């Protein structure tokens, strides 16, 4: 368990530095968050970038949970480190470790459920690609940014 946890954390650590800048909350995210009812009805709300507010919250929730799991796992890791800490601290660490794992697992379940709820999202999660129509409908600002980059690249290459 501890060694697998360290490998899991290292994998997440790499992903964190790859995606953190896309997951900073913006003004437009407030509109998305206050319109969750409409979103659950299938309506698109706001000028969403690469990630919507729900995805950003999930990213930061996973970050906090992974850091908590690492720190509390380190404290409780027998026989290597646990002898460095008093028993009451180890007990608190184990409780926080369990709660953090529970929150992480619940978050993943909600994430998968949301992906199933919104058609086309499973493909995005599994294959890492979406159709242009899907991007335009669900993440319009990101779609415009991608199209602007494509247009600039085409113009630079002499294609129109």
What is the meaning of each model-derived region?
Residues 2-160:
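Membrane-embedded alpha-helical bundles that constitute the cytochrome b-like, heme-associated redox core
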């Amino acid at each position: 368990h501890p060694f697998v946890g360290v490998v899991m954390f290292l994998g997440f650590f790499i992903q964190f530095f790859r995606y953190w800048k896309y997951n900073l909350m913006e003004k437009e995210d407030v509109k998305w968050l206050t319109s969750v009812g409409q979103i659950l009805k299938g309506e698109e709300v706001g000028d969403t970038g690469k990630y919507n507010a729900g995805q950003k919250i999930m990213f930061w929730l996973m970050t906090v949970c992974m850091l908590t799991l690492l720190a509390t796992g380190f404290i409780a890791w027998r026989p290597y480190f646990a002898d460095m800490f008093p028993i009451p601290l180890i007990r608190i660490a184990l409780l926080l470790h369990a709660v953090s794992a529970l929150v992480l697992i619940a978050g993943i379940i909600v994430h998968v459920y949301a992906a199933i709820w919104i058609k086309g999202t499973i493909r995005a999660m599994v294959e890492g690609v979406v159709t242009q129509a899907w991007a335009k409908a669900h993440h319009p600002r990101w779609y415009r940014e991608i199209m602007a980059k494509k247009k600039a690249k085409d113009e630079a290459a002499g294609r129109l």
